[in-house]
Amino acid sequence: MAPKEDSLALAEAWNHGFGFIKTSIVKTAVELGIPDILESRGAPVSIPELAAAVDCSADRLYRVMRFLAYHGIFKRTEPPPESTGGGSVYYAQTLVSRRLTRENLGPFVLLQGTMREPSGCVTAETLRMSKRPGLVDDNDSDRLYEDPVFSMKVFRDAMASHARMTTAAVIENYGEGFLGVGSLVDVGGSYGMALSMLVKAFPWLRGICFDLPEVVARASPLKGVEFVAGSMFESIPKADVVMLMFVLHNWSDEECVEILKRCKDAVPKNKGKVIIIDAVIDEDGNGDEFTGARLGLDVTMMANMFEGRERTYVEWAHIINEAGFRRHVVKNIKTLESVIEAYP
């Protein structure tokens, strides 16, 4: 091995040894609200100013910001012309940090490390087990409440931020998919946030948010959204289109087939469709900038929900065909997930 290659390999090994640090420090920055502060200021901020705003040591904060700037989360900049900082170091937001604000994916980052097993923590024991209850066993969310470290508010905020970002991508990059659609059922739609965004963007839609009775009982009224309680394993309300967002990756292939059969029964045979919004993993080397995140999400599902998984195109084709659909189309929406249209 050439000396340079060996040096690069050694550096990579060292980086893996400290790999947990990046996730931990990014989470800390979000907890302190640093991305939001830099975004709201709209101009570079000095370390003393930033330290005062978040009530922490300027020296320690500088070391953290130096680390995050190296990794492209923030950027070190020259002091603005009107600065009176006396040689202080200044930092500004980046496109990445803008995605880490509370209105973007910041709440999702805060979820990391709060689960019973840290999200994505796949141990040798995990790989050896043929059956193990994960974070949620048999769809029983009560276990979430039992862990003193785990906060249901953090979890809900994280899921809401994920849904908000993905729904925005659906609206921007898949708007044509809702043309001519009169009614839409969001299966497992929780409190209706994604559906309310879709109804607002496409006001001709009649939105039906379908979830378990205990979820529907806690939902607040939303304009253009009707809440219906039930089980997706039994029957689903009739509509022109059924949507499954972040649902099927929680379940085994066999369970997915059963869910998809119920969805197929709910839509018109000639003009209906089922929209699946989930990750599609690339295995042919033609992935995009989200491939690494999709693979990370897959092992996170393995760690926290034993049957959960992200699927490849071939794996999606298998369960869709098994459920009896005539054909399906995968559409890129420029985010972690894709839209899969399945036609009965």
Swiss-Prot record:
Q: In which pathway does it act?
A: Flavonoid metabolism
The domain of life for this entry's organism is Eukaryota
Q: What does UniProt list as catalytic?
A: H249 (proton acceptor)
Which GO molecular function annotations are given, in alphabetical order?
A: O-methyltransferase activity; protein dimerization activity
Task: Write the signal peptide boundaries.
Answer: none
Biological process annotations from GO: methylation
Task: Give residues annotated as binding S-adenosyl-L-methionine.
Answer: D211
State the EC number(s).
2.1.1.-, 2.1.1.232
* Catalyses which reaction(s): scutellarein + S-adenosyl-L-methionine = scutellarein 7-methyl ether + S-adenosyl-L-homocysteine; 4',7,8-trihydroxyflavone + S-adenosyl-L-methionine = 4',8-dihydroxy-7-methoxyflavone + S-adenosyl-L-homocysteine; isorhamnetin + S-adenosyl-L-methionine = rhamnacene + S-adenosyl-L-homocysteine + H(+); kaempferol + S-adenosyl-L-methionine = kaempferol 7-methyl ether + S-adenosyl-L-homocysteine + H(+)
| Matches recorded under InterPro entries | COMT-like, O_MeTrfase_dom, Plant_O-MeTrfase_dimerisation, SAM-dependent_MTases_sf, WH-like_DNA-bd_sf, WH_DNA-bd_sf
Record's keyword terms, sorted:
Methyltransferase, S-adenosyl-L-methionine, Transferase
Which purpose does this protein serve, as stated in its record? Flavonoid 7-O-methyltransferase involved in the biosynthesis of polymethoxylated flavonoids natural products such as pebrellin, aroma compounds which contribute to the flavor of peppermint, and exhibit pharmacological activities such as anti-allergic, anti-oxidant, antibacterial, anti-proliferative, and anti-inflammatory effects.
UniProt lists the family membership as follows: Belongs to the class I-like SAM-binding methyltransferase superfamily. Cation-independent O-methyltransferase family.
Q: How does it assemble?
A: Homodimer.
Protein name from the UniProt record: Flavonoid 7-O-methyltransferase 1B
